[in-house]
A protein has these predicted regions:
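Alpha/beta-hydrolase superfamily serine-hydrolase fold, recognizing
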Residues: 1-183
Length: 183
């Protein structure tokens, strides 16, 4: 959040349009982008025009169907997710805190429009899709896409598969972000 707030204060010298600030992240970065969006709303700024969440972890305290069914053999395992969660919050008992698990926020109303991309064979798929549903229910404009045949991390491998390249450059991400921050 502090980096985003700093960027907003430095937008003019950097030649940025403060009406078109967006946050984006994949995996843990998607979790952080969701959290930054929540903090920006709760703290009265900076105003964000868009959030892009690519296979985000949104519930470190839960156990979704995809987490159970895809817990092994799909690049990202449930054991790895638990370990990442422990590194993130330690043994503080904060896994259910909405700033750690955005899906558990009491309200998502007033957040910026979002693109949420999930991967078919990702243990985090269901919680990412549940977050998109909660955003939509809160009146937030959402583009939500499940990338069929994809594993967690595919956006970091755009040349590994034509599907990843298409998702990033054309279908979901490029079009949504262009509408939000460029046009």
């Amino acid at each position: 959040y502090a980096a985003t707030a700093w960027l907003a204060t430095q937008a003019k010298p950097l030649g940025l349009d403060t009406q078109r600030l967006a946050v984006c992240g994949d995996s843990a970065g998607g979790t952080l982008a969701a959290t930054v969006s929540m903090l920006a709303k709760d703290r009265g700024g900076p105003r964000l025009s868009y959030q892009v969440l690519i296979y985000p972890g949104t519930d470190f305290a839960g156990q979704s169907t995809s987490m159970r069914e895809l817990s092994e053999g799909h690049l990202l395992s449930a054991a790895m997710i638990r370990w990442f969660g422990e590194c993130y919050v330690g043994e503080t008992g904060q896994a259910a805190n909405p700033l750690v698990s955005p899906l558990r926020a009491p309200s998502l109303a007033g957040l910026p429009p979002a693109t949420v991309i999930t991967a078919e064979y990702d243990p985090l798929r269901d919680e990412g899709e549940a977050y998109a549903d909660r955003l939509r229910e809160a009146g937030v404009s959402v583009v939500a896409r499940r990338s069929l045949g994809m594993l967690h991390g595919f956006a970091s491998m755009p040349y590994a598969t034509p599907v990843a390249d298409r998702v990033i450059a054309e279908d979901h991400l490029g079009e949504s972000v262009t509408k939000a921050v460029i046009t």
